Amino acid sequence: CAANTMLLDGRLKLFLQVCEAVSHAHANLIVHRDLKPSNILVTPNGDVRLLDFGIAKLLDDPEPAPVHPRTEVRAFTLHYAAPEQVRGELVTTMTDVYSLGVVLYELLADTKPYRLRRQTDAEWEEAILAVEPLKPSVATLRTTDGSRARCPETRRNARKLVGDLDNIALKALAKQPEQRY
């Protein structure tokens, strides 16, 4: 969306289609477990398709998910992983809600929810587990050189995020699964 400079309303319409697709998967007892922009395809006529269900899990699967120590290779994309995935805990539909929250945050603020210095996996894990992200309306104005904050269009977009959109994104990024929706 950023590459195509899609306006906020257009981004939100596409995101709602993503949410509908994820809701359909959840209604069929499927958790995607690796939702991220590269697994979301927008067709030329504007329809959204979810891709790569390779690590998806059936919720009624009697086989418990293996617990992975933090040092073991895991099958998910860390930047979009929920805290319970990082900890190697049980994955539920709320895991996908967290990943959707990261995608929404990026659509709203044009940045990831966590600002890291070194971008190491350990720093990402710590942020996912312990750092509370800024509101998207605040994050959209923060850059290292302040150039975006000086742009009238950026300030106008930030004002559109204050309130409901800020709250929805942060609710989806709650650290505890039972606090997300």
Please provide the spans of the model-predicted regions.
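C-terminal lobe helix-coil module of Hanks-type protein kinase domains
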Residues: 4-8, 13-23, 27, 31, ...
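Regulatory activation segment
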Residues: 63-75
